[in-house]
UniProtKB/Swiss-Prot annotation:
Membrane topology: Multi-pass membrane protein
Species, as recorded: Halalkalibacterium halodurans (strain ATCC BAA-125 / DSM 18197 / FERM 7344 / JCM 9153 / C-125) (Bacillus halodurans)
Protein's UniProt name: Fluoride-specific ion channel FluC 2
Subcellular location field: Cell membrane
Binding-site residues for Na(+), renumbered to this chain: G75, T78
């Protein structure tokens, strides 16, 4: 039970931080008329989640930290629902731009998740060897 409470608190704190960053990014990009904020959030969040996933396979942290950063921070920062809403709104005015936006979100998100995963794998494996060699 105590572990569950730690995880819930970590998810709440991570979610508050992630959501706050998402709000700030959307506020900063709002005047562009294009959903750059959501695109950036989802690509950066995908990179970060890919990085953390790989890192946590090599360097195993406490479960509450994994959940706080993954479910909380990344979950609060990224947003599928806003991606969907932005796509529909963009489609109503600029159908081709909507297609580009969805493709960039999908392929950019997956590509950057893979990039983060591969980068963390190299860094974490090197770090683990250095620590083991010390």
């Amino acid at each position: 039970m105590r572990q569950t409470v730690k995880e819930i608190v970590a998810i709440g704190i991570g979610g508050a931080i992630g959501t706050s960053f998402r709000f700030l990014l959307n506020t900063w990009t709002l005047t562009t008329g294009y959903p750059y904020g959501t695109l950036i959030e989802n690509i950066v969040g995908s990179f970060l989640l890919g990085f953390l996933t790989s890192w946590f396979l090599v360097i195993v942290p406490k479960e509450w930290l994994k959940k706080g950063l993954g479910v909380g921070l990344c979950g609060g920062f990224t947003t599928m629902s806003t991606l969907a809403a932005d796509s529909v709104l963009l489609y109503s005015h600029h159908p081709f731009s909507s297609l580009i936006y969805v493709a960039a979100s999908l392929f950019g998100g997956i590509g950057f998740a893979l990039l983060g995963y591969l980068l963390a794998s190299k860094i974490a494996t090197r770090r683990k060897r250095e620590v083991a060699g010390s």
